[in-house]
Regions:
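Catalytic-site neighborhoods of secreted/periplasmic enzymes
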Residues: 97-160
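Solvent-exposed loop/turn segments at secondary-structure junctions
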Residues: 42-46, 66-67, 73-78, 132-136, ...
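Active-site nucleophile/metal-coordination loop of metallo-enzymes that catalyze phosphate/sulfate
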Residues: 26-33, 45-123
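Loop/turn elements at helix/coil->beta-strand transitions in domains of secreted/extracellular proteins
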Residues: 32-37, 63-68, 120-126, 175-183, ...
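Bacterial N-terminal signal peptides
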Residues: 8-19
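Metal-dependent active-site segment of extracytoplasmic phospho-/sulfohydrolases and closely related
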Residues: 37-41, 56, 221-260, 295
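Active-site His/acidic residue clusters
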Residues: 141-142, 174-221
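Membrane-interface soluble catalytic domains
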Residues: 25-32, 231-237, 253-261, 268, ...
Length: 408
């Protein structure tokens, strides 16, 4: 316990210095954008820019920085299960990747976590627009919100699509002069699900890239809306002072959907454009936790205190000094957890291998291993490790232990 208290005290001391460090690294006020927009395309596959003609997105890619793969954590959504999961019991109503992206960290602090909008609220106007009610647990510290949609509302006859999101986004843009906006276009995620439910013989059955795919159509229509939104920014005189981050909340598997254990669902593109961002550059890798620290740096505000993503210095005209080199911790964690999941599945499927509730032998060892496994649905406990390196080390040791239990 003493070691834990000392560690917490040390962490508190470090965090107390964060505002001073960030302030020292922020760009001069004259160079800062006046509006930051996080523009989320639901279920935005990293393959989309290469497979679908998206002229408005392509134009922004040429004007800014393009990251081919933006990695998020495993794409679980434990918000709707029964009995309620710890995730739901802590009040979260969306999938895990949304919360991670808005926090700038995968080391979430249940009950205490702050989000990017808190970096502006209350003195700078914030706005959130989405055609889905699942993100309501992330809606704090937004002055203006328009959210409606989702499975239940559609079943009840409400037609709330991306067109409504565009309407409210442009309305807020004109009427309330926001400094930060989170715009979430939901229709692509809904359309991807139609591939799973398509009748047998359909060219897009279990294939979002098949001929006539609703997902492709939704991507193309969303690109039209993106162009219209950018036109509104230009007509209102805001474009030259706006920085935009266009990405997904998660990717999409070819069959449609975003199961936690499917790598296709973990990656989406990221396009950054606006003042302070290099033009016409392309990079291979980033992480969703990097978006908030980079956005906050450009806007001259402090990110959430526990945000540990990396400022994307390689994409910036005037990056801060001493940005650490690129690592791939989120990718490493995802693949490590997938390996553990696969080994556990084999062990528990072995004849008579149900974990015992006590006693000696391999069964009780397996039960202990399961308790030591902090999978994605236990993400609210990850912060107890303190760092990603410690989390990774723990799970590498767990994987090695599990492999010794494998049936001969």
């Amino acid at each position: 316990m003493k070691r834990f208290v000392v560690a917490c005290a040390t962490l508190a001391g470090v965090l107390s210095l964060v505002p001073l460090i960030i302030d020292a690294q922020q760009p001069p006020a004259a160079q800062r954008p006046e509006l930051a927009i996080l523009y989320t395309v639901d279920g935005f596959s990293d393959k989309a820019p290469g497979r679908v003609k998206l002229p408005n997105l392509e134009a922004l890619m040429a004007q800014g920085a393009y990251f081919r793969q933006n990695w998020t954590v495993q794409t679980a959504d434990p918000s709707n299960g029964f009995p309620p999961s710890p995730w739901a019991q802590n009040g979260y109503t969306s999938s895990i990747p949304n919360v991670v992206q808005m926090s700038g960290t995968a080391m979430l602090l249940p009950g205490k976590q702050k989000y990017v909008q808190d970096s502006f609220f209350p003195l700078k106007i914030t706005a959130h627009v989405v055609n889905e009610i699942s993100y309501r647990s992330l809606d704090g510290s937004f002055h203006y919100t328009a959210q409606a949609g989702g499975t239940g509302m559609r079943a009840a006859g409400y037609k709330v699509g991306n067109d409504k999101t565009l309407f409210w986004a442009t309305t807020f843009l004109r009427e309330v002069d926001p400094t930060f906006m989170w715009i979430h276009m939901q229709d692509t995620g809904v359309a991807a699900g139609e591939s799973r439910n398509a009748p047998a013989g359909s060219p897009y059955k279990d294939n979002i890239w098949g001929e006539g795919s609703p997902y492709i159509k939704a991507l193309q229509q969303q690109d039209v809306y993106l162009g219209q939104f950018v036109d509104t920014l230009k007509k209102t005189g805001k474009w030259e002072k706006t920085v935009m981050f266009i990405t997904g909340d998660h990717g999409e598997q070819t069959a449609g959907g975003h199961p936690a254990n499917v790598p296709e669902a973990w990656t989406m593109p990221l396009v950054m454009v606006g003042p302070g961002i290099k033009k016409g550059v392309t990079f291979d890798y980033t992480e969703s936790i990097d978006t908030v620290p980079t956005l906050c740096y450009l806007m001259g505000v402090n990110p959430p205190l526990n945000a540990d993503g990396r400022i994307l210095a390689e994409a910036l005209v005037n990056p801060p000094a001493n940005v650490p080199p690129r690592q791939q911790k989120i990718k490493e964690i995802n693949l490590l957890l997938l390996d553990i999941e696969n080994v556990l599945a084999k062990l528990t499927a072995a004849p008579g291998a149900a974990p015992a509730r006590g006693g000696q032998g391999r069964f009780s060892a397996l039960r202990q291993a399961q308790q030591d496994y902090f999978d994605i649905e236990r993400i609210l406990e990850w912060h107890q490790f303190g760092t990603y390196d410690r989390f990774i080390e723990h799970h590498k040791e767990l994987l090695a232990r599990l492999k010794t239990m494998s049936p001969k």
